[in-house]
Swiss-Prot record:
Binding site for ATP: 143, 146, 148, 150, 205-207, 215, 217, 231, 271, 284, 286
Name of this chain's protein: Translation initiation factor eIF2 assembly protein
Spans annotated as Disordered: 90-115
Gene it is expressed from: cdc123
Organism name: Dictyostelium discoideum (Social amoeba)
Localization per Swiss-Prot or TrEMBL: Cytoplasm
Protein's UniProt keywords contain Aminoacyl-tRNA synthetase: no
Length: 384
């Protein structure tokens, strides 16, 4: 591992939820951290998913949290209230696994445990999760050390991260590419006992009815708040223009009073949520690194000297385009960016997890581009 990779991983470890939660407990949502045994990690990394039929509710009605019911700030959503069986499938070794992408998945399969783990084998953990859900009011959303399975939310009966039982949680965790990435951060000794604890934790956070329009990412360099970006850059929220200054003032006050000088690093990013009465809540911390989305900024203007990349590393297309259009000047004072009109909307990269693998590969791995070009490319590949 190279020197800058080691530095990044050390910074990333400081952003693990269990590393900062106790210090910032008063300004974030109530949560319970559960250490995970090796057998559960094996379960998440295996391709097997089975659950008793009674684990799936036949009907659910979404309930809003009174404290964070900010629906009047955004367009109402259509909530899924009935179970669609096609989203819940059991897989076994007897199924036909032949497909065009077999070769591309061979290496991934080799890394995964070959054993099949049944949920009854970690019943004690499941009981602990059930009790924790009850303590948090019956509705939670899950995450691991760093990531939440937001890319798999469409698999959930609520079409969100809201979970009410272990089946909801296990389905989201096993369906998420983000969670799979978390599981590659630490090496687990396969010779360890099943009940031995791993570096991984399951975080259960009290469910809040948050509106994506009021989530923001903040960028800090040497304890100076340099940038604030709209978190959901795939949507234009017209009302944000009128609220922009009040939102900025609220975030700056929150940072100065609750975050500045208290995190374990001087340069980092943090996500926060602003309620309709300008109360700010901390959501998460992330390290300064190209793997952390800069959203409406580019890293060269935020913290260029801290972004260590190999010369041969492929540049992000947006970064290359920005460099060609005009020189990038590093920011010296706070800048708050939102999408000012519909022309500023950017692709939601998390949505690529919902695309068919063949289509994703045909679009260069991003799912972006002119759909006619993608389909033509896909057709030509099949003809060859």
């Amino acid at each position: 591992m190279e020197k800058h990779d080691i530095k990044y991983f050390e910074n990333k470890k400081q952003c693990q939820f269990q590393e900062w939660y106790e210090k910032f407990k008063s300004v974030t949502f109530s949560s319970i951290v559960i250490p995970l045994p090796k057998i559960f990690i094996d379960y998440l990394q295996s391709d097997q998913f089975t659950t008793p039929h009674e684990g799936f509710p036949e009907f659910k009605v979404d309930e809003h949290d009174d404290l964070f019911d900010d629906n009047n700030w955004s367009t109402s959503k259509n909530h899924i209230s009935t179970l669609d069986p096609k989203y819940y499938q059991g897989y076994s070794d007897e199924e036909d696994e032949s497909s065009d992408d077999d070769d591309s998945n061979d290496n991934d399969k080799d890394k995964k445990p070959k054993r099949i783990v049944n949920e009854t084998e970690f019943k004690e953990l499941s009981n602990q999760i059930i009790k924790s859900i009850e303590k948090l009011g019956g509705n939670i959303f899950p995450k691991l050390n760093w990531s939440s399975p937001k890319d798999a939310s469409w698999m959930n009966v609520y079409n969100s991260l809201k979970c009410t039982n272990t089946t909801d949680i296990y389905l989201l965790l096993k369906s998420s590419d983000f969670i799979n990435h978390d599981l590659m951060q630490f090496s687990i000794n396969q010779d360890d006992k099943d009940d031995s604890l791993t570096p991984y934790v399951l975080v259960l956070r009290k469910w809040q009815n948050l509106q994506p329009s009021m989530e923001f990412r903040c960028f800090v360099k040497d304890n100076q708040l340099l940038g604030i970006s709209q978190r959901d850059i795939s949507t234009y929220f017209k009302f944000l223009k009128d609220k922009k200054q009040k939102i900025q003032d609220a975030i700056v006050k929150f940072y100065n009073e609750s975050i500045c000088g208290k995190f374990s690093n001087n340069s980092f990013t943090f996500d926060c949520y602003v309620t309709k009465d300008e109360q700010v809540w901390l959501i998460d911390f992330n390290p300064i690194h190209p793997s952390t989305e800069a959203l409406l900024f580019v890293w060269d203007e935020l913290i260029p000297e801290l972004i260590e990349q190999d010369q041969d590393e492929k540049e992000n297309e947006e970064t290359k385009q920005a460099k060609e259009e005009l020189p990038i000047e590093p920011l010296t004072k706070l800048e708050f960016r939102i999408i000012d009109d519909e022309s500023g909307i950017k692709p939601n990269l998390a949505m690529t997890s919902r695309l068919p693998l063949d289509l994703l590969q045909s679009s260069g791995g991003t799912g972006q581009g002119n759909i006619n070009d993608i389909l033509l490319n896909f057709k030509n590949q099949n003809l060859n």
